[in-house]
């Protein structure tokens, strides 16, 4: 089980996790908000630029949410969170207007039992060992 302390930004604490993309010659680790209210994982397009993957190589789609409608490109990339490797389906967008990349329910939450402990200000991620796409290392 991975226990991750919340990240403090000013006076607020947020449940974040390190996500390591393994699609490049050298792995790239970024922080993302573990967001049970997000249907999909949505990351800034700059992450793809660092991985040297063209944004347009993904499937073009529009997402709608509280902040309005944004254009994004759907990609499926190998990632590692804690000691678990799995393919993450993620939408990359140049129009993402929130301060964090988002790990949403579709695909990410299928790999972990997620517990938000507000009192301790930490997130616990317990891998589902029987899941066919996740591999604990």
Q: What are the roles of these predicted feature ranges?
A:
Residues 1-137:
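Pepsin/retropepsin-fold aspartyl endopeptidases
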């Amino acid at each position: 089980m991975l226990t991750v302390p919340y990240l403090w930004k000013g006076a607020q604490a947020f449940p974040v996790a390190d996500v390591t993309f393994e699609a490049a010659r050298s792995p790239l680790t970024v922080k993302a908000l573990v967001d049970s209210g997000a249907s999909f994982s949505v990351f800034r397009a700059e992450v793809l630029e660092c991985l040297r993957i063209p944004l347009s190589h993904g499937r073009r789609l529009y997402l709608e949410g509280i902040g309005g409608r944004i254009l994004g490109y759907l990609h499926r990339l190998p990632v590692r969170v804690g000691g678990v490797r799995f393919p993450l389906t993620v939408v990359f967008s140049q129009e993402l207007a929130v301060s964090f990349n988002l790990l949403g329910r579709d695909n990410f939450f299928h790999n972990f039992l997620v517990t938000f402990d507000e009192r301790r200000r930490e997130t616990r991620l317990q891998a589902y060992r029987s899941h066919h796409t996740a591999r604990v290392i």
